[in-house]
Swiss-Prot record:
<dbReference type="InterPro" id="IPR001015">
    <property type="entry name" value="Ferrochelatase"/>
</dbReference>
<protein>
    <recommendedName>
        <fullName>Coproporphyrin III ferrochelatase</fullName>
        <ecNumber>4.99.1.9</ecNumber>
    </recommendedName>
</protein>
<keyword id="KW-0408">Iron</keyword>
<comment type="function">
    <text>Involved in coproporphyrin-dependent heme b biosynthesis. Catalyzes the insertion of ferrous iron into coproporphyrin III to form Fe-coproporphyrin III.</text>
</comment>
<comment type="similarity">
    <text>Belongs to the ferrochelatase family.</text>
</comment>
<keyword id="KW-0456">Lyase</keyword>
<keyword id="KW-0479">Metal-binding</keyword>
<comment type="pathway">
    <text>Porphyrin-containing compound metabolism; protoheme biosynthesis.</text>
</comment>
<dbReference type="GO" id="GO:0046872">
    <property type="term" value="F:metal ion binding"/>
</dbReference>
<dbReference type="GO" id="GO:0004325">
    <property type="term" value="F:ferrochelatase activity"/>
</dbReference>
<dbReference type="InterPro" id="IPR019772">
    <property type="entry name" value="Ferrochelatase_AS"/>
</dbReference>
<dbReference type="InterPro" id="IPR033659">
    <property type="entry name" value="Ferrochelatase_N"/>
</dbReference>
<feature type="binding site">
    <location>
        <position position="121"/>
    </location>
    <ligand>
        <name>Fe-coproporphyrin III</name>
    </ligand>
</feature>
<keyword id="KW-0350">Heme biosynthesis</keyword>
<feature type="binding site">
    <location>
        <position position="52"/>
    </location>
    <ligand>
        <name>Fe-coproporphyrin III</name>
    </ligand>
</feature>
<feature type="binding site">
    <location>
        <position position="181"/>
    </location>
    <ligand>
        <name>Fe(2+)</name>
    </ligand>
</feature>
<feature type="binding site">
    <location>
        <position position="264"/>
    </location>
    <ligand>
        <name>Fe(2+)</name>
    </ligand>
</feature>
Length: 346
């Protein structure tokens, strides 16, 4: 399959104080979230001047993708679109149409299956094509990449760097925690079932092994919504408190669920969890996310090559890449058929 463009598709984020509330209203539209709750979340962004890191990181990533294309001797225009803020996906697809693009690969800045991590990006693609009208380019989403060797390598390396930042006498006893964004249990059950949580669990095992850890914990973070609705657990804050009770003196936190420093990383982890850990007498080191690492750019182009048929899928050994599963080469599939469920649980 040939492509004449690449679309980097992401979540979006505000880039100034006056954009914070409109952005949050976009994110929560139709969910009935009280405005006072939005105002509370807005304070997290305002702590950083109303600027989310994500757009700047994505622009830097696009720069790395373009540089990598040049290093490979390839020419492929790269476009940028978001779900919730400027530049919107509708504008990006319309620009591609106006530039004469006929078929584009779509690289979503999410490594996972499930609804918000995959299906919603397919909905974004459909919305973008609808906005561009009858002459809209064909858009093909690239696969989930939770098991790509470069993603595993980047996270494993970042764990080692984080460990070295701890006091020398605490490094060997530090507990390694992998964290990802929690979602409602019912939502996880509907997609796969449990494709998202299974992929996170599998990637956690891959990265831990690559980093040289046989013992670690997988936790969840950033839940929202009414307490009566069950979300994936354990919550990272509850788990850190439990570790303190057991006498743990240091933790290394790897935000494996995030490919970039979203506000959930720089606020929820670097501010809230770090403050909690300090209050409990626990030293904390946070592993970096891929952000705009050149290897992340290479990963994106590897996926394009896979879909073009130029190379076999790159996966860490242990995952069956059978077509039709949520982790097939064509990333439009966001949940498994029943025959696929057992393939990433062993």
């Amino acid at each position: 399959m040939l492509f004449d463009a690449l679309l980097v598709l992401s979540f979006g984020g505000p880039e100034g104080p006056d954009q914070v509330m409109p952005f949050l209203e976009n994110v929560t539209r139709g969910r009935g979230i009280p405005r006072e709750r939005l105002a509370s979340v807005a304070e997290h962004y305002l702590h950083f001047g109303g600027v989310s890191p994500i757009n700047g990181i994505n622009r830097a990533l696009i720069g790395e993708i373009e540089a990598e294309l040049g290093a490979r001797g390839e020419t492929l225009p790269v476009y940028f679109g978001n779900r919730n803020w400027d530049p919107y996906v509708e504008d990006a697809v319309t620009a591609m149409r106006d530039d004469g693009v006929r078929r584009a690969a779509v690289f979503a800045t999410s490594a996972w299956g499930g609804y918000s991590s995959c299906t919603q990006y397919n909905e974004d693609i459909a919305r973008g094509r609808a906005a561009a009208g009858d002459s809209a380019p064909q858009l093909v989403k690239l696969r989930h990449y939770f098991d790509h060797p470069l993603l595993v390598e980047m996270f494993a390396e970042s764990i080692g760097v984080a460990a070295q930042s701890l006091p020398a006498d605490l490094r060997d006893e530090a507990r390694l925690l992998f964290t990802a964004h929690s979602i409602p249990v019912a939502a996880d059950d509907r997609h796969g079932p449990n494709l998202y949580s299974r992929q996170v669990a599998y990637a956690t095992r891959l990265v831990a092994a690559a980093a040289g850890y046989s013992e670690f914990d997988q936790v969840w973070q950033s839940r929202s919504g009414p307490p009566r609705i069950p979300w994936l657990e354990p919550d990272i804050g509850d788990h850190v408190a439990a570790l303190a009770e057991r006498g743990t003196k240091a933790v290394i936190i790897c935000p494996i669920g995030f490919v970039a420093d979203h506000i959930e990383v720089v606020w929820d982890l670097d501010s809230e969890v770090r403050e909690q850990a300090a209050d409990l007498g626990i030293a904390m080191a946070r592993a970096r996310t891929p952000n705009a690492d050149r290897r992340y750019a290479r990963l994106a182009l590897d996926l394009v090559d896979e879909l073009r048929g130029d190379r076999d899928p790159l996966r860490v050994a242990g995952v069956d890449p059978a077509p039709g599963c949520g982790y097939s080469v064509d990333g439009t599939t966001c949940a498994d058929s029943p025959r696929c469920v057992a393939r990433i649980t062993g």
